[in-house]
From Swiss-Prot:
PANTHER family: RIBOSOMAL PROTEIN S15, BACTERIAL AND ORGANELLAR, SMALL RIBOSOMAL SUBUNIT PROTEIN US15M
Name assigned to this protein: Small ribosomal subunit protein uS15
InterPro entries: Ribosomal_uS15, Ribosomal_uS15_bac-type, uS15_NS1_RNA-bd_sf
Function statement: One of the primary rRNA binding proteins, it binds directly to 16S rRNA where it helps nucleate assembly of the platform of the 30S subunit by binding and bridging several RNA helices of the 16S rRNA. Forms an intersubunit bridge (bridge B4) with the 23S rRNA of the 50S subunit in the ribosome.
Amino acid sequence: MALDSAKKAEIVAKFAKKPGDTGSTEVQVALLTARIIELTEHLKIYKKDFSSRLGLLKLVGQRKRLLSYLKRKDYNSYSKLITELNLRDK
């Protein structure tokens, strides 16, 4: 369920702080969100794919940890990011 390189480059370009920025928290959260959306669509079709479901839960947990880190360190970019990605604020 990996993202193709064109879609990944598009997400990186949209959320990067500077050119070539692939490791910032915002980019990581955006990439995880795209993978979560793809896995969710996959699991709607293949309901008994339990290994993918476990992978989805791991991705959601990782995104949750990154979002809590971003919320602590830079609340303004956190609030901007969750509005762009249509995520709920906890």
